């Protein structure tokens, strides 16, 4: 199960005591700032969590699976995420049944 924006908003409401409108605005602002940074070609670094970066993929040959015809796949930019070592350690500790708190 994935954590959604609506669930994140509810968690801010429940745990911090913000009203629902304020919690929703904070979540939306956070997402918008991340989107804007990535659209401008900047990376997003969240300490202890990970990094979002843009990677440029060059044009490459592809193949239509139905016809077998070779077609070009356009160059594009993709967003990549690299988890921090701290996040990786916490996930691994949770998987092994350890406390995961460092």
Curated annotation (Swiss-Prot):
Top-level lineage group: Bacteria
Gene Ontology molecular functions: DNA binding; structural constituent of chromatin
GO CC field: cytosol
GO biological process: DNA recombination; positive regulation of metabolic process; regulation of DNA-templated transcription; regulation of translation
InterPro entries hit by this protein: Hist_DNA-bd (IPR000119), Histone-like_DNA-bd_CS (IPR020816), IHF-like_DNA-bd_dom_sf (IPR010992), IHF_alpha (IPR005684)
Alphabetically ordered keywords of this record: DNA recombination, DNA-binding, Transcription, Transcription regulation, Translation regulation
Keyword rRNA-binding assigned: no
UniProt-listed SUPFAM superfamilies: IHF-like DNA-binding proteins
Coiled coil: none
Region of interest: Disordered: 49-70
Described purpose of this protein according to its UniProt entry: This protein is one of the two subunits of integration host factor, a specific DNA-binding protein that functions in genetic recombination as well as in transcriptional and translational control.
PANTHER family assigned: DNA-BINDING PROTEIN HU, INTEGRATION HOST FACTOR SUBUNIT ALPHA
Assembly information from the UniProt record: Heterodimer of an alpha and a beta chain.
UniProt similarity note: Belongs to the bacterial histone-like protein family.
NCBIfam families given in the database record: himA, PRK00285.1
UniProt-recorded name of the protein: Integration host factor subunit alpha
Species annotation: Nitrosomonas europaea (strain ATCC 19718 / CIP 103999 / KCTC 2705 / NBRC 14298)
């Amino acid at each position: 199960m994935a954590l959604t924006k609506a669930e994140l908003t509810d968690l801010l409401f429940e745990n911090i005591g913000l009203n629902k409108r304020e919690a929703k605005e904070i979540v939306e602002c956070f997402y918008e700032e991340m989107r804007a940074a990535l659209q401008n070609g900047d990376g997003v670094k969240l300490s202890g969590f990970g990094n979002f970066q843009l990677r440029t993929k060059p044009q490459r040959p592809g193949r239509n699976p139905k016809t077998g015809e070779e077609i070009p796949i356009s160059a594009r930019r993709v967003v990549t995420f690299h988890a921090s070592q701290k996040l990786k350690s916490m996930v691994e500790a949770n998987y092994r049944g350890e406390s995961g708190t460092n």
